[in-house]
Amino acid sequence: MILNEDIRAREVRLIGVDGQQVGVVSKNEALRKAADADLDLVLLSPNAKPPVARIMDYGKFRFEQQKKAKENRKNQKVMAVKEIRLSPTIEGNDFDTKLKHVRKFLTKGAKVRVSIRFRGRAITHKELGKQVLEKMADEASDLSNVVTKPKMEGRSMFLMLAPLSEKDKKKK
């Protein structure tokens, strides 16, 4: 932000301490008014014709901006991504155990990446892996949405599940 003597414009549209528009005044007059109030002259929009400046306590303004930014960072929700690895030939009980883990992660609000690693000649039976992933998505459909459908990446096939949003929960 540009403030006080660093302002290059000869005239500025001045906004007073109380937020009321004073009008278009010379830079020197605006600086004098700011000095009389023992505050700073801050250039808000330098590209406007004439540029808009406001009389305010810049230190307090910067503190408020930092506080808002910190609050926004705190309110951001970081999505954890958990990974569950399966084999293309997984059987009943093992599948159920992995499904239980997927459900637990989804209820805690984490995204889940379900992956299948094809070893050796198993890569020739990609359809088996796809069936297992589709079955997993189907079984967890009451708690999740499919973000990415089963797709190959090197020797692995994966599927991404995200927990249902509040809107989606109401639909189901």
Curated annotation (Swiss-Prot):
A biological process term (GO) from this entry? ribosome disassembly
Key words, A-Z: Cytoplasm, Initiation factor, Protein biosynthesis
- Top-level taxonomic group: Bacteria
Annotated Gene Ontology MF terms? Answer: ribosome binding; translation initiation factor activity
What coarse category fits the chief subcellular location reported for this protein? Answer: cytoplasm
> What compartments host this protein?
Cytoplasm
Spans traversing the lipid bilayer: none
Family, according to the entry, reads as follows: Belongs to the IF-3 family.
PANTHER family hit by this protein: TRANSLATION INITIATION FACTOR IF-3, TRANSLATION INITIATION FACTOR IF-3, MITOCHONDRIAL
Name of this chain's protein = Translation initiation factor IF-3
Point out the gene that encodes the protein: infC
